Amino acid sequence: MAESFKEHLQEAFEDLGADNLRKFKSKLGDRRQEPRVTKSAIEKLKDEIDLADLMVGVFTSKDAVSVTVEILRAIKCNAVADDLLRNTGQSESKGALSDESKCASSKAVSKVAFSKVNFIDEHWKELIDRVNNVDPILDILRQKKVITNEDYCTIRNKETPQKKMRELLTGPITCAGNKGKEVLYDALRESNKFLMDDLEDAE
C-alpha cells in the first residue's frame, strides 16, 4: 500500500509541469508545521521520484498525500489535488496528523537534529578554516542564548576569523553540547549558505 501511495504521488508531481512543480517545492520548503522539510533537502531533489520518496520518508504515506493536497490547493492546482484524492481513496484532510505520523514526525525531527550535530563534529576543521564572517553567527548564537555577552565580546575581539571559530567551537559550543551544535548549524546555514552547501555536497 505504501508503494501505491508513492506511485500516485509521483504521478501527481509529473502532472504539475515544471512551473507548478517549482511552486510546490517552494511552498513545501516554507511550510512551518512539523515535521518540516529543509530547503537543502529540497534542493537536492533530482526528479519527481525523489520528491515522492522524500514526502513518504518525512511523513507517513497517508499524511504525505494530505500534505501534498494541502500544498496543491495553496498553489491553485485543484484538479491535480482532486485526482490524487480520488486515486488514493483519501478524504480531504483537516490538517491533523495521525498518531502514526506523529510518531514518525518525532523520529524524523530526532534524525534531523542528529545529522546537524554530526555535521558540526565531522566538519570541525573545515569550519575553522573556511568561515570568514563569524560576527553574524555570534549575533544569532547570542540571541538564542547559546553564548553569553562575555563570550560574544571575547570571541569578537579575536584577530582572525579562524581564531574566532576555534574559540567558539572549543569553548561555548562544546559546553552547550548537542543543542548548541544544532543552533550553530542553523546559524551557519543562514549566514554561510554556499559554504554549507559545498560541505554537504562533499559528503
Swiss-Prot record:
InterPro entries linked: CARD (IPR001315), CARD8/ASC/NALP1_CARD (IPR033516), DAPIN (IPR004020), DEATH-like_dom_sf (IPR011029), NLRP_Inflammasome (IPR051249)
Tissue: Expressed in the kidney, intestine and gill. Expressed at low levels in the heart.
Residue ranges crossing the lipid bilayer per the database entry: none
Primary subcellular site in the record, as a coarse category: cytoplasm
CARD domain mapped to chain residues: 112-203
Induction: Up-regulated in response to infection with the bacteria E.tarda.
Subcellular location: Cytoplasm; Inflammasome
Cellular component per GO, a single term: NLRP3 inflammasome complex
Domain Pyrin: 1-91
Protein name: Apoptosis-associated speck-like protein containing a CARD
Lineage, opening ranks: Eukaryota, Metazoa, Chordata, Craniata, Vertebrata
